[in-house]
Design a protein with these regions (language model features):
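Proline-centered turn/helix-capping motifs that create local helix->coil transitions or kinks
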Residues: 1-11, 72-75, 81, 85-88, ...
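C-terminal catalytic core of Y-nucleophile DNA break-rejoin enzymes
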Residues: 76-78, 94-118, 136-141, 149-167
Length: 167
């Protein structure tokens, strides 16, 4: 033998994502959720925690939530965008969800409806201002089309109080 490899040993091998075993998926039981929310009641972020537990939203989906995605009449919430922080570039980026399966319409439970309706009813009248007129622009990764997200449509949460930011 001359110790030469004539063919790459990985030729013909397909790389696939590892399949996650169902017992590897971590979730809170109903009792754990109840204890968590009882403890979180004192938190400024209680509404966010409760909404995530009620709807199954990911964090980026929740902070990218806009009022036009909420249908109070039909009691649904549509996930069609996310908001994520780009640490290296030091800015927030609004964009589409990461996968096609992430686009979805979620029926609101009575509790989720109460949370969102409470936030909607407690917000001050929107006033036009230069700040509210600013837009976030992003490029849709799938289509390459430049899109615009209007700031006044975003629901920003004041992390100190846990309530919607007042503009």
């Amino acid at each position: 033998m001359n110790d030469l490899i004539t063919k790459h040993p990985m030729d013909g091998v397909r790389f696939t994502k590892p399949v996650r075993a169902t017992d590897d998926i971590k979730f809170l039981t109903r009792d754990e959720q109840r204890v968590f929310l009882k403890t979180a009641k004192r938190s400024r972020n209680y509404n966010q925690y409760a909404l995530i537990l009620e709807t199954g939203l990911r964090t980026g989906e929740m902070i990218g939530l806009t009022w036009d995605a909420i249908d109070f009449q039909n009691r649904t919430l549509t996930v069609n965008k996310t908001l994520e922080y780009r640490h290296k570039q030091h800015f927030w980026r609004a964009g589409p969800p990461k996968t096609q399966q992430s686009y979805r319409t979620i029926p609101l439970t009575d509790r989720a409806y109460e949370i969102l309706k409470g936030i909607w009813d407690s917000r001050p009248e929107q006033k036009e201002s230069p700040t509210l007129a600013k837009t976030l622009e992003y490029i849709d990764r799938r289509t390459g089309v430049s899109s615009r997200l209007v700031m006044r449509d975003l629901v920003f949460i004041n992390w100190r109080t846990g309530e919607p930011a007042k503009n």
